[in-house]
Amino acid sequence: MQVVHTVADLRAALSEADRSAFVPTMGNLHAGHVSLVELAKRHGGPVVASIFVNPLQFGAGEDFERYPRTLAADCDKLAEAGCDLVFAPDTSALYPVAQTFRVDVPAALAEDLCGAFRPGHFAGVATVVLKLFNLVRPQVAVFGRKDYQQLLVVREMVRQFNLPIDIVAGATLRDPDGLAMSSRNGYLSAAERAQAPQLQRELAAIVAAIDGGARNFAALAAAARQRLTGAGWRVDYVEIRDAESLKTATQETEALVVLAAAWLGQTRLIDNLEVTSAAGIAA
């Protein structure tokens, strides 16, 4: 596996590749990231992973400075997973001048759900992803379903800019107790980690209720928020949405996704479960 840090070295490493599959990350990798690399390998060509903690997607008071930088350990995991090339630029390599141009993500996607609590976040995500797409020029890019809103933002950006990239979604990996794997789980204290699976359980309860015929979506979400708040969580949102557009679900909505973001102590956790009328949880 080759590791490069500059744009010139990245281009040289890919100069003879007819196609590639790309997995963008911020590092501090876990088994969920590894599964995305393994999924990328199914699509032919070298697998490229990026490791870059993107300052544009962090707001004031967020965890940019304390986000773990674990490049050596990350490269070991990527090599074991069969990754071919790692692009690990520093900030000056990816942003050689002030990034005054940004991707303008529509408010319906950028200012709802996580965007309502993290202003500018999705513009920062879309901007860095577009830059990385321009540099790597992949035919396939793999993103995790755990960051569901991010996945839809990237898909819509690719569609609207006519980018010749197939966006592939990888399933959310979970610990045995149901907690979705996340680089930020390491922030949790032992007591918080023991409580954290409640978030997934609340989403699963909503999915089960919908599968059982419940259709008062507002009441289901409100009850989950109340239970989480009563257990000491600080809830940003619990919502039931159209899985394709993230618009508020109605009785006619066929594909549903239940999404949540909530804080345990100083750690913000997100999760989601998709709903299908026949099979319940899809991911």
Curated annotation (Swiss-Prot):
<comment type="function">
    <text>Catalyzes the condensation of pantoate with beta-alanine in an ATP-dependent reaction via a pantoyl-adenylate intermediate.</text>
</comment>
<keyword id="KW-0963">Cytoplasm</keyword>
<protein>
    <recommendedName>
        <fullName>Pantothenate synthetase</fullName>
        <ecNumber>6.3.2.1</ecNumber>
    </recommendedName>
</protein>
<feature type="binding site">
    <location>
        <begin position="26"/>
        <end position="33"/>
    </location>
    <ligand>
        <name>ATP</name>
    </ligand>
</feature>
<keyword id="KW-0436">Ligase</keyword>
<dbReference type="InterPro" id="IPR003721">
    <property type="entry name" value="Pantoate_ligase"/>
</dbReference>
<keyword id="KW-0547">Nucleotide-binding</keyword>
<feature type="active site" description="Proton donor">
    <location>
        <position position="33"/>
    </location>
</feature>
<feature type="binding site">
    <location>
        <position position="57"/>
    </location>
    <ligand>
        <name>(R)-pantoate</name>
    </ligand>
</feature>
<comment type="pathway">
    <text>Cofactor biosynthesis; (R)-pantothenate biosynthesis; (R)-pantothenate from (R)-pantoate and beta-alanine: step 1/1.</text>
</comment>
<dbReference type="InterPro" id="IPR042176">
    <property type="entry name" value="Pantoate_ligase_C"/>
</dbReference>
<keyword id="KW-0067">ATP-binding</keyword>
<dbReference type="GO" id="GO:0005524">
    <property type="term" value="F:ATP binding"/>
</dbReference>
<keyword id="KW-0566">Pantothenate biosynthesis</keyword>
<comment type="similarity">
    <text>Belongs to the pantothenate synthetase family.</text>
</comment>
<feature type="binding site">
    <location>
        <begin position="181"/>
        <end position="184"/>
    </location>
    <ligand>
        <name>ATP</name>
    </ligand>
</feature>
<feature type="binding site">
    <location>
        <position position="57"/>
    </location>
    <ligand>
        <name>beta-alanine</name>
    </ligand>
</feature>
<comment type="subunit">
    <text>Homodimer.</text>
</comment>
<dbReference type="GO" id="GO:0015940">
    <property type="term" value="P:pantothenate biosynthetic process"/>
</dbReference>
<dbReference type="Pfam" id="PF02569">
    <property type="entry name" value="Pantoate_ligase"/>
</dbReference>
<feature type="binding site">
    <location>
        <begin position="144"/>
        <end position="147"/>
    </location>
    <ligand>
        <name>ATP</name>
    </ligand>
</feature>
<dbReference type="GO" id="GO:0005829">
    <property type="term" value="C:cytosol"/>
</dbReference>
<feature type="binding site">
    <location>
        <position position="150"/>
    </location>
    <ligand>
        <name>(R)-pantoate</name>
    </ligand>
</feature>
<dbReference type="InterPro" id="IPR014729">
    <property type="entry name" value="Rossmann-like_a/b/a_fold"/>
</dbReference>
<feature type="binding site">
    <location>
        <position position="173"/>
    </location>
    <ligand>
        <name>ATP</name>
    </ligand>
</feature>
<dbReference type="GO" id="GO:0004592">
    <property type="term" value="F:pantoate-beta-alanine ligase activity"/>
</dbReference>
